[in-house]
Amino acid sequence: LSSSVVFVEKWPVLGRHGKAAEWLQVWSDLGRAARTIDAYGRGLSEFLIVCEREGVDPLTAGRADVAVFVRELTERPHRRGANVASIDSGAGLSNATIQQRLVPVRLFFGFLVEEGLRESNPVGRGRFVPGRHHGGTRRGLVPRFTKLPWIPDEQQWRDVLAVAADEPIRNRVMLALAYDAALRRAELCSLRTDDVDPGRRMLRVRAEVTKNRRERTVPYSAPTGVLLTGYLARRATISRARGPLFLSESRRNHGEPLTLWTWSKVVRRIALAAGVERFSTHTTRHLCLTDLARMGWELHAIATFAGHRNTDTTLQYIHLSDRDLADKLAKGMDHIHAWRVAMLTGAEATGTAK
């Protein structure tokens, strides 16, 4: 089946609005990640359903029509709380989620402008440009609230590590690498055996699994290297084949690549057991980058290490000074990372990973 047929099967409303399916096909053909396409398709289909209910033609919808969609998002029951009273009330869909839902709507209208089917974009922030998510200077419909990433305090981190110390070695090395190399969830779970260079203690993060589609190479510390060596020995008892680094040890999926969702469940279980409910798969990344900023790393060095395309994203982790990445790791990162991962590396492997 062609991807356009799959889109229509998954989101029938796109098939009722041909330009919508065509727009999503463009982004798919441009090589956007499957999860990005899924988010775009879901977000635009929600908007189109609201248009149909309100009797509005999406090709001629105006700012007021998009505002109706925003209102519905703000009134939608949140799975973890009550209905929202206002965009910044703290209940209902978060400001970030609403912004995400508006991205495909804005891009779709930008596409219609480029196609000559309308003159302006009611969502604002510029026109459809392949490879870019935004442009222009017009203010968006919904104010964007920028919050600093949450990171655990030292006691919370110790509580997490105390629980993690009793985890199987696979889970401990994943936590250690997630912190040590500031890896995103998808980057961590997608690591392959040939992405690891134990001799140089370096990881290759392949372009196809990164958020900005740019490959990078990042170092990891000696304590994590010791833990990784132990895991590789464990992995060899499951499979000697090259391929995905982290494998399932459950009866149902024994030897299969570990999924993003399984890793999320592992981290969630650890967080709840430690009494640190806000701890997530992305927390280790935030903590690592914050530590680098505290140690005086220069802005562009952190951006390179993190795989940030825009240094504006990196600014939240503070201002820095210049030096070579690997050299900085040896001189500065080790003494902070070593104690952070000591509890992970100090316990013998126990139990079976799921």
Feature-to-residue mapping (PLM):
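Short, basic (Lys/Arg/His-rich) helix/loop patches that form interaction surfaces
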Residues: 264-304, 308
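N-terminal core-binding DNA-recognition domain of tyrosine recombinases/integrases
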Residues: 21-35, 45-138
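Conserved tyrosine-mediated DNA breakage-rejoining catalytic core shared by Y-recombinases
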Residues: 131, 185-186, 190-230
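Active-site/catalytic core of tyrosine-dependent DNA strand-transfer enzymes
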Residues: 221-276
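Basic, Lys/Arg- and aromatic-enriched nucleic-acid-binding interface segment
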Residues: 152-185
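C-terminal secondary-structure termini that scaffold catalytic or DNA-interacting sites
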Residues: 3-5, 331-354
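Catalytic-site neighborhood detector that most strongly recognizes the C-terminal catalytic loop/helix
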Residues: 209, 306-331
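Short, charged phosphate-coordinating catalytic segments
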Residues: 114-119, 178-201, 300
